[in-house]
Amino acid sequence: FYFGVGLKNYRNEVRKKKYENTEYIDTKKRFTTHPHQVHYEFLSETGITGYFTFIIFIFSSLFLAIKSYLKTNNLYQLSGIIFVLTSILPIIPSGSFFSTYSSSIFWINFAIMCGYLRKN
């Protein structure tokens, strides 16, 4: 609960007998490699400690970037801010955050968003 099952270990944990639902007929189809939602993935793999650390890191970075954007009106920074915000919306399903192409794009946009903080 506090520390999760470890990065990319969701697929191993979900196959354990203790999570098996005997009322569900096709139990083989319940196995998946990741939770398909970034918040659930962080909670299950890094626990409540890792989740809150991630959220604080992202939102404090967003706060600084928005504050910087309001001073400079840099459109590159704005595009990074918008991408990061839409990527962490809880209503949007996502691929595995730790091992997909989309997570690479997320971190590139995060770097663009934060890269213009030094210019102020």
Describe these PLM feature segments:
Residues 45-88:
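Hydrophobic transmembrane alpha-helices and their immediate junctions
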Residues 14-15, 19-23, 60-65, 108-109, ...:
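A short hydrophobic/aromatic micro-motif that marks alpha-helical segments and, especially, helix-coil
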Residues 1-46:
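Long extracytoplasmic/lumenal interhelical loops at the membrane interface
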Residues 7-11, 50-53, 97-98, 114:
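Short, flexible micro-motifs
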Residues 57, 80-92, 96-120:
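Transmembrane alpha-helices of multi-pass inner-membrane enzymes
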Residues 3-5, 46-49, 93, 110:
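Short glycine-rich loop/turn motifs that provide flexible caps or phosphate-binding loops at active sites
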Residues 36, 40, 53, 97-101:
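Membrane-embedded glycan-lipid processing machinery
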